[in-house]
């Protein structure tokens, strides 16, 4: 950021401002014309002798204003104001209502209407005639107007996205920067008004989105294009003259002439960037920069009176218009004078005293307390019987999660991200906080979705403040009843998990008291909106609980809920379980088999795609040569190949969905293994999320887990084997000769 700043002379804020223009309507000095999105046109006179904020006139139109231009567009009439709107091009004349020229009015002369919305325009100067206006529509078609006549209309360009346009009178060339390409067109080609697409003389790939274009006249005309990340200059033949790389995003650009140096060899330009900086260049040489204290989207260099010539006029996105000039005094600090004498002995004593205070403060625990930042609390709110959200399962209940924030002073907005397998109206929420409030809260409903069945009831909330760059994250488990409802038990389910306890089993109808079951030894649950069921059984003789289901993904969430309820009902009881490694191996085998089939389908898709393209090429060649006899055979072959291609793509998508479901089941088994290991007081890194949110293969993740989650015993053995050439104690190692004798 520059140390120098722009000194403000005149400023005013007009809401919904879209464009600004400097034009001379009287007294051989310039006035400022401001156009708005609401159709308002304001003509102000900053160089007025009494007040700088003097407004000549304000006119309301019915259309949003895109661009304005001022010139002698009509014969025998000077300084006509041309206003471009999405549907009209309107000409206005300025009439003064008072003899002292302090008040004026805008009178509409005539207008041209468009059938397609306009995008921008440029002025085409004509020797010994009135200037013309070239308008580009939103679909990249050009229309030329001269006064009240339309020369031609809707001439198409070879582009889809409109961009800046400019005209060079010296070479009579039109420049367009559409689709990220700068192209040159001879203006004489468009004089016929043909509806055929026009060929370019030359084109250049800018590699970025063009924002603004300026064209300079003279013996060496130059086209200067401002893009988001660079400024490029081109000569008449399309060669790059120079280029400037911007450190921030470019916002606006304007050219100007120096009042003291009359040298047309160089181009002088001002570029504004998104980091509130104005860059003043002489061609590609940076001669000055300053802090604009705003990010201008429009720039002008105007002379409003003889006292303030070549002042800079800027327009901000919020409608603030500032007229100022470059300051030469740094606004951050001033360098000390060279005559200041520093007493180094006193400075050293001062540093020693400060160091002693810091040591005493550290010994006492520190005098500076760490700022806690934003505090977040999660709690379960109302549980409703049925939600009306469109993405919810049929007859699914909802649960409101209350998110409470505290210590949010000076925080205006919080970005909340939601991570949960349960559905909600939105995964991203923006919470607006009042500036005078220190607390805020929001309720977010959760329910079972209609597209994806959840395998976990865990909800993670992350709140981020863009201003302070602070982020807080909390997690909570949704109630079990939000996901499941009571159903019939299934004793013949394929997948089982056993939970052992040191004490007698507890009645299941008491553990799950919110359900209406009266059976103390068996209870069944089904996921809302689906036929997925899970059953829980209690065995009094063996003091065990058994969980059975046809869906692996339901074992983990049910076992976790069961263990939590047992621990709450009987504190201190020992609980354990057997990790189902055979289910993991079975799921891994199925994933590998599906991935093999997916690779075969991918090869088949590539083969059929090449075959379809070859048939299309043969068909086009036959049409060009006129050999139409083999078209029925090619049509039949194309139909067969295309159907096989569609079948292979359907199979590929189906296998991809199956692989994702199997991966979700495997992640659930990993979390189940982590939960059962934790019951035995063994923490492991292999949980349900260590592979879920990565793009790595399972083999790579397991390698990382083995290196990361190793016990001290394995580390000791590894170090001993790598660095100890001695024999291990208490282990008899026989020599090779003795082994050979025993073998003989």
From Swiss-Prot:
Natural source organism: Caenorhabditis elegans
Look up the signal peptide feature and give its range. Answer: none
* Top-rank taxon: Eukaryota
Note down the stretches annotated as region Disordered. Answer: 722-744
Listed under GO biological process in this entry are: cilium assembly; protein transport
Q: Name one GO cellular component term.
A: BBSome
Listed transmembrane segments: none
Q: Which InterPro entries match?
A: PHTB1_N_dom, PTHB1, PTHB1_hp_dom, PTHB1_pf_dom, WD40_repeat_dom_sf
Biased composition, class Acidic residues, residue ranges: 734-744
Q: Basic and acidic residues: which segments have biased composition? A: 722-733
Per its record, how is this protein called by name? Protein pthb1 homolog
Sorted alphabetically, the keyword list is: Cilium biogenesis/degradation, Protein transport, Transport
A Pfam family this protein belongs to? PTHB1_hp
Assembly description: Part of BBSome complex, that contains bbs-1, bbs-2, bbs-4, bbs-5, osm-12, bbs-8/ttc-8 and bbs-9. Interacts with bbs-1.
Q: What is the documented function of this protein?
A: Component of the BBSome complex. The BBSome complex is thought to function as a coat complex required for sorting of specific membrane proteins to the primary cilia. The BBSome complex is required for ciliogenesis but is dispensable for centriolar satellite function. Required for proper BBSome complex assembly and its ciliary localization. Required for cilia biogenesis and both the assembly and movement of intraflagellar transport proteins along the ciliary axoneme.
Query: Per the record, what phenotype accompanies loss of this gene's function?
Result: Mutants have normal body morphology, but with reduced body length and width, delayed larval development and decreased roaming movements. Defective cilia structure and function characterized by an increased accumulation and mislocalization of intraflagellar transport proteins and impaired movement of intraflagellar transport proteins along the ciliary axoneme. Disrupted assembly of the BBSome complex at the base of the cilia. Defective avoidance of nitric oxide and P.aeruginosa.
